[in-house]
């Protein structure tokens, strides 16, 4: 198990596109406190925490997942509210556990569920999002 967090400040995406996340609401102070508490809990349980200036947590998750794909019998489950993580789903080897609409339910996405939701496999999500 590992945990990945965004760091404050701009990322390489802001440099490439100045309006990146320009329409996004400011993060709530209570959420910031909850994230800090979560980091403390992860640290207390010895869970490694990864962050890197200029990169978002999902970039780091993608890098870790890519490195783990070489492991033959390793199943990876990503727990994230960021639906961009669905692009990492790879048959039964990589799945994404996320919230359904709202916070009342959860869903574990495998390749079949991603395809059912979007009408195409996870590997095409990057192109789809780029064209939207």
Segments and roles (model prediction):
Residues 1-5, 9-21, 34-40:
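Extended, highly charged clamp/arch subdomains and adjacent linkers
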């Amino acid at each position: 198990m590992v945990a990945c967090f965004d760091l404050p400040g701009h990322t390489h995406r802001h440099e490439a596109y100045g309006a990146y996340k320009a329409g996004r609401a400011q993060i709530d102070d209570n959420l910031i406190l909850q994230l800090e508490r979560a980091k403390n809990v992860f640290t207390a349980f010895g869970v490694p925490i990864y962050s890197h200036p200029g990169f978002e947590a999902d970039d780091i998750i993608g890098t870790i997942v890519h490195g783990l794909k070489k492991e033959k019998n390793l199943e990876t489950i990503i727990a994230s509210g960021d639906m961009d993580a669905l692009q990492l789903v790879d048959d039964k080897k990589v799945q994404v556990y996320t919230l359904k609409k709202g916070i009342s339910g959860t869903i574990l996405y495998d390749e079949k569920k991603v395809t059912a939701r979007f009408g195409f496999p996870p590997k095409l999500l990057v192109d789809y999002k780029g064209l939207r």
